[in-house]
């Protein structure tokens, strides 16, 4: 029972009375002048060119810097503040560009005709051509980050507010940098504080998520929603009247501090002026004008209702504040994670592990890599979920009709999700090699999974083969039939139908369920019920029909996802040992081969599985974003004449009607304001091709070449003092996959932007 009284003496723990150690590690500026100071070997400086690569590989590998887990954890904690500082500086730069160089006011006044821009190119060598006409007498580079739409949702109405945010973000960055230094050098937390996971969960749930959502709900209720109501009324041509004055322009909108005056805001939302008496008397219906449950999209802006968003964040806040009181800390009540896990037994037939989840709490609490792995897997999955919500339920005003921004945000969150999930596999592998102690995991669920790994991997391999041959086979069949002039024998909506009946059922229950649930919304997202919302003559959202083409490409998605998982899971389950290399754990997380004399043992390290999974992740997500791009252009935005259903059922159709037809804009971009995307398209192809040099050739080839070049230098008496050394096998693969991914991503970036900017 997890709410049992505390063990004798449990309340007497003094961790919180002294959670930090004072002055544990004084600042040593001499170290900063010595690259690789954490390693006696690296700190001696370079003898060969391998030194710089080892420096990169180990700079952030705190495990190898010191054998002290507490010290490594403190470095991670301090680095988090550094990361937050970088984020605040990045945010400040965005705010500053918005305040100083953008056309935000012009866009805010006419968001359906003016395009967002936040950068103007200086006419130094004639590149001012890149400044396109974005409307309202502004020439600049069109942006697709969605910040203008987000700022409007926040309630920002002028550049002065953006400049204040820019200054505030820089101040926050300085505070974060100070905090990072302070909590490593002056007052560093003790290991007991890091290990107090119940306190951590309570504070993260109630503080970060609960109070964070409550604060945002407060801002949305008092500033965001009233400002949005005034702006929406202006855009709809029926401005509101406050204190007898018509709010006809943005300049007429009250300042944020004025909106906190009940007398003013009560004319927009009477519920906001009704006082707190209704709250304490449980007459919450009085607040239903600014805490709504409308559902669907605002027809003026094509986005979610701001009052729905405020209600959502208030509900989230309540949930997480309650959740933040769930775990047992000082008061002897609540859950203990260790007790929950130690007591948990799996199904006796499916998961007959005699010791259940015993040992998992300690493994998760002590292994930073295990924690990071789980967090990356969850956050990566969440990012992919977000990418779908961004277009189906567009949260920011007018973002749904900024097609490049919709496509860009979908693509961005997909890439982030994929990288995080591969990162989860990487750190799970590191955890198995460095942190897993088999003696502590005898017959628990982790041990049983490792013992069943052959069955798991062989079955997963069979699933991959089945999905691959069948899904690809459908395309081969269709290409063959179309090539032979037999459309009646193709899998298509007009011939042999393969309808995605389960997906269609899920779509239907979204709309049929309205009015039958406990929380009765007034509508449902247009993505499900087939209605069309147009804003400024452009489709913001309409029903998305699914057919044979979607079923076929979805099975390609399933195939590629399963292969990515197969590679990652094999890398984790065989990280410590395999039949081929029983002592793999002693070789570490990354190694090229199992030494000389053991042929056929290369590319078996856990790191190499991550390397291979990155390619599959990249290919998988390329098909996902291509599917999304073409589907939206064809069936929602009305840009390609609805050709997806008939063209996407053959490989030739994908090559001809998607890649080739839609590359017209980037290939003919020279001489236009989008010409930089043409240059980027070529340059990124070069970076991608450059990667193949590292991926296709071995270390010996290059070392042999270097020996010849060094000989020539010696003859001329210009030999380098640092000996040239070919990249190691692992280093070469790392450089190769990095350029492969960067080149591929930047190529796609240029392709998408030129396409949607080019057709306006």
UniProtKB/Swiss-Prot annotation:
TM segment ranges: 76-99, 162-185, 201-225, 309-327, 368-391, 407-433, 455-477, 551-569, 609-630, 674-696, 734-754
Binding-site list for divinyl chlorophyll a: 693, 701
Chain spans, region Disordered: 1-22
Annotated positions binding [4Fe-4S] cluster: 593, 602
Superkingdom of the source species: Bacteria
InterPro entries xrefs: PSI_PsaA (IPR006243), PSI_PsaA/B (IPR001280), PSI_PsaA/B_CS (IPR020586), PSI_PsaA/B_sf (IPR036408)
Annotated residues for binding of divinylchlorophyll a': 685
GO biological process: photosynthesis
Any GO CC annotation of this UniProt entry: plasma membrane-derived thylakoid membrane
Membrane topology annotation: Multi-pass membrane protein
Single GO molecular function: electron transfer activity
Catalytic reactions on record: reduced [plastocyanin] + hnu + oxidized [2Fe-2S]-[ferredoxin] = oxidized [plastocyanin] + reduced [2Fe-2S]-[ferredoxin]
EC number: 1.97.1.12
Cellular compartments annotated: Cellular thylakoid membrane
Principal location class: membrane
Regions of compositional bias (Basic and acidic residues) in chain numbering: 8-22
Cofactor: how bound: PSI electron transfer chain: 5 divinyl chlorophyll a, 1 divinyl chlorophyll a', 2 phylloquinones and 3 4Fe-4S clusters. PSI core antenna: 90 divinyl chlorophyll a, 22 carotenoids, 3 phospholipids and 1 galactolipid. P700 is a divinyl chlorophyll a/divinyl chlorophyll a' dimer, A0 is one or more divinyl chlorophyll a, A1 is one or both phylloquinones and FX is a shared 4Fe-4S iron-sulfur center.
Residues that hold phylloquinone according to the record: 702
SUPFAM superfamilies: Photosystem I subunits PsaA/PsaB
Keywords from the named record: 4Fe-4S, Chlorophyll, Chromophore, Electron transport, Iron, Iron-sulfur, Magnesium, Membrane, Metal-binding, Oxidoreductase, Photosynthesis, Photosystem I, Thylakoid, Transmembrane, Transmembrane helix, Transport
Quaternary structure (record): The PsaA/B heterodimer binds the P700 divinyl chlorophyll special pair and subsequent electron acceptors. PSI consists of a core antenna complex that captures photons, and an electron transfer chain that converts photonic excitation into a charge separation. The cyanobacterial PSI reaction center is composed of one copy each of PsaA,B,C,D,E,F,I,J,K,L,M and X, and forms trimeric complexes.
Assigned protein family: Belongs to the PsaA/PsaB family.
Functional summary from the UniProt entry: PsaA and PsaB bind P700, the primary electron donor of photosystem I (PSI), as well as the electron acceptors A0, A1 and FX. PSI is a plastocyanin/cytochrome c6-ferredoxin oxidoreductase, converting photonic excitation into a charge separation, which transfers an electron from the donor P700 chlorophyll pair to the spectroscopically characterized acceptors A0, A1, FX, FA and FB in turn. Oxidized P700 is reduced on the lumenal side of the thylakoid membrane by plastocyanin or cytochrome c6.
Protein name: Photosystem I P700 chlorophyll a apoprotein A1
Organism in which the protein naturally occurs: Prochlorococcus marinus (strain MIT 9515)
Lineage: Bacteria, Bacillati, Cyanobacteriota, Cyanophyceae, Synechococcales
């Amino acid at each position: 029972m997890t709410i049992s009284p505390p063990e004798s003496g449990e309340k007497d723990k003094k961790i919180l009375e002294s959670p930090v150690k004072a002055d544990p590690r004084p600042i040593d500026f001499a170290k900063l002048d010595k690259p690789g100071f954490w390693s006696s070997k690296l700190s001696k400086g370079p003898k060969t060119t391998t030194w710089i690569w080892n420096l990169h590989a180990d700079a952030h590998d705190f495990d190898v810097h010191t054998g002290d887990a507490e010290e490594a954890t403190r470095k991670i904690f301090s680095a988090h503040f550094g990361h937050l500082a970088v984020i605040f500086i990045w945010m400040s730069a965005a705010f500053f560009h918005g305040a100083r160089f953008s056309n935000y006011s012009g866009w805010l006044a006419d968001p359906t005709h003016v395009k967002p821009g936040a950068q103007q190119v200086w006419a130094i060598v004639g590149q001012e051509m890149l400044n396109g006409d974005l409307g309202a007498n502004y020439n600049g580079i069109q942006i697709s980050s969605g910040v203008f739409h987000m700022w409007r949702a926040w309630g920002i109405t002028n550049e002065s507010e953006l400049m204040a945010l820019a200054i505030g973000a820089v101040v926050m960055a300085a505070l974060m940098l100070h905090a990072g230094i302070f909590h490593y050098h002056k007052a560093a937390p003790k290991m007991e504080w890091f290990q107090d996971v119940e306190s951590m969960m309570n504070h993260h749930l109630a503080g970060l998520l609960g109070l964070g959502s409550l604060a945002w709900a407060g801002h949305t209720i008092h500033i965001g929603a009233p400002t949005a109501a005034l702006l929406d009324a202006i855009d709809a041509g029926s401005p509101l009247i406050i204190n007898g004055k018509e709010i006809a322009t943005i300049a007429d909108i009250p300042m944020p501090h004025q909106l906190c005056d009940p007398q003013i805001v009560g004319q927009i939302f009477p519920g906001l002026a009704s006082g707190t008496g209704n709250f304490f008397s449980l007459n919450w219906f009085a607040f239903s004008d600014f805490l709504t449950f409308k559902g669907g999209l605002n027809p003026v802006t094509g986005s979610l209702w701001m009052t729905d968003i405020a209600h959502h964040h208030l509900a989230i806040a309540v949930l997480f504040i309650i959740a933040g009181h769930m775990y047992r800390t000082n008061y002897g009540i609540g859950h203990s994670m260790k007790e929950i896990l130690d007591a948990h037994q799996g199904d006796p037939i499916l998961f007959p592990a005699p010791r259940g989840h015993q040992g998992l709490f300690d493994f998760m609490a002590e292994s930073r890599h295990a924690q990071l792995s789980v967090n990356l897997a969850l956050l990566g999955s969440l990012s992919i979920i977000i990418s779908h919500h961004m277009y189906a339920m567009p949260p920011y005003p007018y973002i749904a009709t900024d097609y490049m921004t919709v496509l860009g945000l979908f693509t961005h969150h997909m890439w982030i999700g994929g990288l995080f999930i591969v990162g989860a596999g990487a750190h799970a592998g590191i955890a198995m090699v460095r942190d897993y102690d088999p003696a502590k995991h005898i017959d628990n669920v982790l041990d049983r999974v490792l013992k069943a790994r052959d069955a798991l991997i062989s079955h997963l391999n069979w699933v991959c083969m089945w999905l691959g041959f069948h899904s690809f086979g459908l395309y081969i069949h269709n290409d063959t039939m179309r090539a032979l002039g037999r459309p009646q024998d193709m899998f298509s909506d007009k011939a042999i139908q393969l309808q995605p009946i389960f997906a269609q059922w899920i779509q239907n229950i979204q709309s049929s369920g309205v009015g039958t649930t406990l929380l009765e919304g007034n509508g449902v997202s247009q993505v499900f019920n087939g209605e069309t919302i147009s804003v400024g003559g452009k489709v913001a959202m309409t029903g998305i029909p699914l057919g044979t083409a979607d079923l076929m490409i979805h099975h390609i998605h399933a195939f590629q996802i399963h292969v990515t998982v197969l590679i990652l899971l094999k890398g984790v389950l065989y990280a410590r040992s395999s039949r081929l290399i029983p002592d793999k754990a002693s070789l570490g997380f990354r190694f090229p081969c199992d030494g000389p004399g053991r042929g056929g043992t290369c590319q078996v390290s856990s790191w190499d599985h991550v390397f291979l999974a990155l390619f599959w992740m990249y290919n998988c997500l390329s098909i996902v974003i291509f599917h999304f791009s073409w589907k939206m252009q064809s069936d929602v935005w009305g840009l390609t004449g609805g050709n997806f259903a008939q063209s996407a059922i053959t490989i030739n159709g994908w090559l001809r009607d998607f890649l080739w037809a839609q590359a017209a804009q980037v290939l003919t971009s020279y001489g236009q304001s989008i010409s930089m995307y043409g240059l980027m398209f070529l340059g990124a192809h070069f970076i991608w091709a450059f990667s193949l040099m590292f991926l296709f050739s071995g270390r010996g080839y290059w070392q042999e070449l270097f020996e010849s070049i060094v000989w020539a230098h010696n003859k001329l008496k210009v030999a380098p003092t640092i000996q040239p050394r070919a990249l190691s096998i692992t280093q070469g693969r790392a450089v190769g996959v990095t350029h492969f991914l960067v080149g591929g991503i930047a190529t796609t970036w240029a392709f998408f932007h030129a396409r949607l900017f080019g057709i306006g």
